[in-house]
UniProtKB/Swiss-Prot annotation:
It comes from Hyperthermus butylicus (strain DSM 5456 / JCM 9403 / PLM1-5). Belongs to the TOP6A family. It holds the Pfam family Topo_VI_alpha. Its cofactor is Mg(2+). One of its GO terms (cellular component) is chromosome. Relaxes both positive and negative superturns and exhibits a strong decatenase activity. The active site is at Y106 (o-(5'-phospho-dna)-tyrosine intermediate). It catalyses: ATP-dependent breakage, passage and rejoining of double-stranded DNA. Mg(2+) binds at E207, D259. Gene3D superfamilies: 3.40.1360.10, Winged helix-like DNA-binding domain superfamily/Winged helix DNA-binding domain (1.10.10.10). Its EC number is 5.6.2.2. This is Type 2 DNA topoisomerase 6 subunit A. One of its GO terms (molecular function) is DNA binding. Homodimer. Heterotetramer of two Top6A and two Top6B chains.
Amino acid sequence: MAEEYVDVVDIEARKKALAVFREKFKEILEQVMRGENPTIMLPKRTLSNTIYDEKRKLLLLGPEKLKRSFFDLHESKKFMQTLLMARIIYEALERNEYPTIRDLYYRGKHTIVYREPGGRRHEENTWDEQRESDAVIRDIEVFTGLLREEMLILSKEKGKVVGNMRIRSGGDIIDLSKMGHGAYAIEPTPDLIEFIDVDAEYVLVVEKDAVFQQLHRIGFWKKHRAILITSAGQPDRATRRFVRRLNEELGLPVYILTDADPYGWYIYSVFKIGSITLSYESERLATPNARFIGVSMTDIFGYKSKKPYLTEQERRNFIIKAKEADIKRAYELKNYKWFQTKKWQIEIDIFLEKKAKLEIEAMTSKGLRFLADKYLPEKIETGDWIE
């Protein structure tokens, strides 16, 4: 009879999370034992309390705190929601479970029935919608300093990866170079992945899954010794963390390929400096030295001595007219501190002048080999990227 596999990485992750929970929530118990009003102090997760650290190139939470007390009528429900969710997560860690955020919503969802001193009956739901329980999970993240992935909470897999690399996950050694026409789905707990060995010079992250599949099928990653990843649109947390680890632990440069429009550029910035709405995650999820490889406006139209990759006829054929929402988004990006470098201001100004955008697929319309064997390698070799 085969011995039962013991996942040491999983065990250590649970031990760490349980220890943090005990330490942080012990403070509340001690307040109760002293006869004090039990209170949780949380960093405020608001736009006004989000700052850009120019030195570290990261979006971070600022110094403002939120006081959540049991005896505050305006905060008591949120206080109890926080303790309820913390208990559910703690029990799941103890039981070696892997709950999803949807599981946590249902595990805590119930109705509390109570009566006023005069006898009037009341009902109060712990929470009504998942967005409420999700917000509580985020509060627990900032309170404990643990990402939900470190609490072994699962979410839907989104990102995919292929390349000349072997990893260990759940006791299995997985060769990412032997995925056939498919790819390895980046698991929602990327810190449980062990990197065994890698033979690659850089990481290429492609916004679009369809372009990722095309590059994969023609063997781009083999020929150019790359780890090829897709975020399939806006990146999920697991993909961002996986990319960060490849850069931080293995020293691989990271290049991001998106559509030439403000939404693609923002996807790049989420990988690089973090998300505005989830800035508390940036220190572990963002990759500050990620490089934007394209598609850039100067690739389309040229700039000074730089020649465009598209002819005038190709521009007429492939360019898409920008919508009002695109233009509005471009002005927003232009005002963000992290887009106020000279190169980014040039890109955004060209976009606003031309009111034109381009999808990555326009480059493949010149031939897939053009994208794979000329455009991408040439831009990497010549350092034609934006940081």
